[in-house]
């Protein structure tokens, strides 16, 4: 039985070529590395939801992220809180984004932006120099600020750290960043959408810089 499962997994090979890559959940780390090497931000097209699942259910991929130690930002939830329920202001959710981002930068986490089946207004509403800088989507601008040799001063990360330090958030990570300015080498950014492969570009292109991203169809091994 175990041997049969191994054979099935081996048959589900990732394909990191062409306009849209294809990758089983178990090989995502390989996909991240390939996209990083190609200077592209991974845009995961989540195809892991079973066909008989309800519309509002978490997909296996979303569940995987929820149990991971990565920095998760639920952008669809933020849209609902700001626009539908009006429970929070844009400034409030931006501060939440900034805190998650700062922790990820200090601890070397992956910043996972979950869009679900929505087109969150990244460019026109949520992105800001002190919260979710637009440069996060450009690997060529992320790489130079990371690690001991990274140049934070004058780069996009400087405004983010300065704002947090000025606000006096009680976060040890911010104090360390403000004093030493070293951003962890392992920091990465991933965006996840549940739009279908044939639909994602139409829905996301106005708010997200798709030209800087690598679409990756993610599936579960069967």
Would you name each region that the model predicts?
Residues 1-222:
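Conformational switch/transducer regions in large eukaryotic molecular machines and scaffolds
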